[in-house]
Amino acid sequence: MSIYVTFKGQVQKICISSGTILQELISTHYPNKNIIACAIDGIMADINTEINENQKIELYDFDSKEGQHVYWHSSAHILGNALVNLYQCKLVNGPALDEGFYYDIDIERPIREEDFADIEKEMQRIINKNIDFRKKMIKKDDLLKMYKDNDYKVHFINNIPDNLISVYYNDEFYDMCQGPHIQSTGLVKAFKILKSSSCYFLNSADNQILQRIYGISFPNKTLLKEYEEKVQKAKEMDHRKIGKELNLYFFHEYSPGSCFWLPDGVVIYNRLMEFLRKEYIKRGFKEVITPNIFHIDLWKESGHYQNYKENIYGISGEDFALKPMNCPGHCIIFKSVERSYKELPLRYADFGVLHRNECSGSLTGLTRVRRFQQDDAHIFTSKSSIKEEIENAIGFLKTVYSIFNFKYELFLSTRPTKFLGTIEEWDVAEKSLKDAIIDSGHTYTLNEGDGAFYGPKIDIILHDILNRKIQCATIQLDFQLPQRFDLKFKNELGMYETPVIIHRAILGSFERFIAILIESYGKHLPFWLHPRQVGLVTIDCKHENYMYTVEKSMLNVVLDLGIRKYTDPKDTLNKKIRKATLDGCKIICILGDKEMEKNEVNVRIGNKTRTYKIEELLEKIKVSIETKKEFIFN
């Protein structure tokens, strides 16, 4: 009998005998390929699974997402085993992450950094034993007896409908999980405990506080070293560190999660906003301003109160709340007058301030805040225009992200098990999204069944300079909200029709996007966006009047040009240049006798210099800002 095996895109037809174990096939046909995971007919499985005729087998090494997930899940089991051996704690949950793994435990004392060496030593002992991962199916009642002293595992078991539940053993250690796993603990060749923190069971503050221990592992030490170098680079580029050095913003205990933007930070914020405003005009968006406070009935009508109330800031003693999103306000605007098909698509953009009641433990610099603004837009359109509007949204996205040299990928999420509307409506909407993606020259990954109940969506995952994957943009179809607000427009036949809403954000929150920019560019933000575009450096005190002349000329051409002056007579020229460099000035203009005599400016970028006439320099600066291109020497 034969099967089809796929590895790294290459399909091979292989003849096998009855009862063949997949590991035997791998040893024979894929030696030295470091296969660590597999899928049989699209379902992830253990490598020691028996295979049958006509099955489709996919093999994965550590270079694949599937392989990494299995590898890190198995590493979490090794961590859990070590923690039980050391501390006799109660295990809760130990999943794989996009990068690494963690295990939550219930323990009487906190795990501190000084404990990491002991944990790593015990993990290494387990790894050195090269213990097999063995799967066993256990009856639910028997498993409840096995975990009778662990309320957390009992909770998970009781939420599993099946009577037979999979458990994985490593010698005497066992842990309930679906798997699959790598063959044995010895395949983990390099690992590190990263950090520990506290968390709540099931993420609810009403539940027990747990300890969460994070780790990372790799099949060789070279990959671990590369990871550590990447982490070190991320620390050096941390937006919290650079933001402080550039004096862009700060936070205060009197308003946790709400940023105090300083003048230079406001420059970046406003330039991003003005850039989008100009794009909105080109693309037919109408900017609106909606209230910050609404009666709670609005959030009940929209459905947000029922599903989102813990994140809504209410006003004590009043039936009002700060808005966490703009869409209900835009629905009120749409409904304020009778609408015709001639007005559609109607594109509302809103930079309004939003508040979300994030728990204090999750607040992280600019990436997780309570007060923020975003490039929020809602497009009210007919079903027939969905594809065109999605294409426009993707084109908008491409324009913006290309300016920042960001790579991205698209994920299409389709109809879930529970959904609003008809299957026919969903099929048409999903086809519109697929066609729009393809016609715009993009590819996509299908997340089948992962759409919201009110409509399919496109998630845009941005890759930053450290190749971290971050979601900022989203394009979401919504059949539900127009129905909740009873939105109507008159179609060509004079009949009332319900519009579709497209929720759309490109940058997402300005706070988070600025954090990404800082961590991608450091102090060297794009020239057009930078608050310190030009540093004026005088060689001597006698050149200060000329410096003010140059400054005035610059501001006459670009009113909001970010200029810093370095004139301290106690500083040498080299020290002034160094200060301007450390301040992040994109170009440094040195002014001395020669420049003053010839009405010129000596421009320095890094270690390169060039002399310009003032008029020539100003034109070059102006063009650089208008085109969003870097200022470079020709």
From Swiss-Prot:
Q: What class of enzyme is it?
A: ligase
Identify the InterPro entries for this entry. Answer: aa-tRNA-synt_IIb, aa-tRNA-synth_II, aa-tRNA-synth_II/BPL/LPL, Anticodon-bd, Anticodon-bd_dom_sf, TGS, Thr-tRNA-ligase_IIa, Thr/Ala-tRNA-synth_IIc_edit
Matching entries from Gene3D superfamilies are given as: Anticodon-binding domain, Bira Bifunctional Protein, Domain 2, Threonyl-trna Synthetase, Chain A, domain 2
Any one of the GO CC terms? mitochondrion
Q: Name one GO biological process term.
A: threonyl-tRNA aminoacylation
State the Gene Ontology terms under molecular function.
ATP binding; threonine-tRNA ligase activity
Domain (TGS): give its ranges: 1-61
* Protein name, entry field: Probable threonine--tRNA ligase, cytoplasmic
Organism, scientific name: Enterocytozoon bieneusi (strain H348)
